[in-house]
Amino acid sequence: MMVKMRIICFLLILPFLSCSASEEEPFVNKQDDPVDGIRIAWDYSSMQCLAPIGGYPRIKKLIDNSLIVVYDASGNGVLRRSFDGGTSWSEPVNVFKQHTYTNKDGLSTTVNIANSELIQLQNGDLVAACNFRPSKDEIAPFAIVIRRSKDLGVTWSEEQILYEGGPRFTDGCWEPSFLQLPNGDLQVYFANESPYRNSDEQEISVLTSHDNGMIWDKDIKTVSFRAGHRDGMPVAIISGNDILVSIEDNKVGQFKPYIVRNSISDNWKIPVSEDSPLRESALLKPLAENIYAGAPYLLRIPTGEILMSYQTTGQRSSNWELSTMEVSIGDKSGRNFSKATRPFDVPFDKEAKWNSLSLLDNKTVAAVASTNAFTSSVGVWMIKGHILSDVQARKNAIILDGDLSQNEWGDDFPLFVGSKGKSNIQSGICYDENNMYISVAAHPNGDLINQLSVYLDPENNCVTMPDKGIYRIDCKNNGNITLNEGDKGGWKMIDSKQITAKVKTGAQQQYTLEISIPFSVLHKIDRKPMRINLMLETSMYKESLTNSTPESTGSWMKVVF
């Protein structure tokens, strides 16, 4: 009887089970926020060691197009120079030397050099700065010191002490950085504990010279101060009619990057306090209180956007000593910093700190850091970064032969992938009435590139997953291609006969590739903006365009026709 009842119950519910099994959940794609504007793509193959032992590096490009790097090493402030864009460097020269200081009571201490800095003035002179740091308390004052060179670093003036803090570590002065105003006034910004000898507080101070640093105002101005806290590590730039100073601010929890600002005309008449609207958290997405992000550095690029580097424990351990360099991109007003990248791949038990940024040319920046990521010692390492922006496609018909001739493609290949390893690709886009053309120059550099993939969102749909109307073209290094169309979050191979590709091989497994894609295949009628992503695949890793993901088309780069 029981068996019969169970059979009857099963037969009654069977239609409902069958119905449920046959019904599929409807696929719902979501809109994705578009990622527009500039990005920084770090070039792993450009990485080099500038000093096997050293720290706190700063690179400056001079008016003669040479480069100078200053850094701290073995208690000295050191300088090296490059005349070939950073490929080779001169022998190191000590601009500031470690020395012994003896006070009036006959007590002596070693004074180390720290926080080396450099600026080239509007008149061509070089001015270097550093922080005098005595190794013993109560003997010598901490100090901000400069030297001048009128012959591009061949000879240097005597040391000039601009400011002296207390003779102890808790009342010191630190981290000088320069700014020259449009009217020629030269400023030195620094972190200053000396006014707060009965507390652990610290402010940002500034000194000004009206004659290119020969004579300095006696009055020191307070730039910013948060009562009960420690504003530190100032770096100043000009943006429009404003002075922007990046600082580290420990308002709550760990240090975070902030921007304090003043108009050039106001020029710090009133200090920026903790509740001033002229003090702003720099990052678009705030970090958790327990994440450290200190030692910020600013760089304005030719298109007006402002880059900021800092050292952070984000997605690492809580030990700030093992933080790594990160670079974010702000808008032209120095706000909303986002699109973070990490120039160096630093293991969790290593560090990349006390970093800075420099502009090498209109399309290239340099990041330098003190790191032991690649050796057992902390040294000075540099890497170059390509400034990528929304792609302006070049209108030109291409003869498909795999040869990326200047007549057809020009000199500009605005897309770059190559941050993870020595292999990299550069790419450009052309078009005519009927076709879109994509060029790729592949540089395996020892890591064979097995496949290149081109991702296209022809209608700029900006969705979170691939679906109908989203395409992926896979290209082998022999020119064989397959075409895939998005399908409910995945990919489905479709006919690729109308797409053609030509490969031209070179030495050491390098090759160039041209692809012709009819607009009709992409069902693209107009020439409104679209989006593109690239991916290279080696036997060890895959890598796509910086700040992009293969699935999310809004993260791909915009192409304008």
Residues covered by each model-derived region:
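Asp-box/BNR beta-propeller blade signature and adjacent active/binding-site loops
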Residues: F27-S389
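Surface-exposed, glycine/proline- and aromatic-rich loop segments on solvent-exposed faces
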Residues: P414-N484, S539-M540
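Sec-dependent signal peptide recognition
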Residues: K4-L11
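Solvent-exposed strand-to-loop "edge" motifs in beta-rich extracellular domains
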Residues: D72, A441-N445, P518-S520
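Glycine-aromatic-enriched beta-strand/loop faces of beta-sandwich-type recognition domains
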Residues: D467-Q510
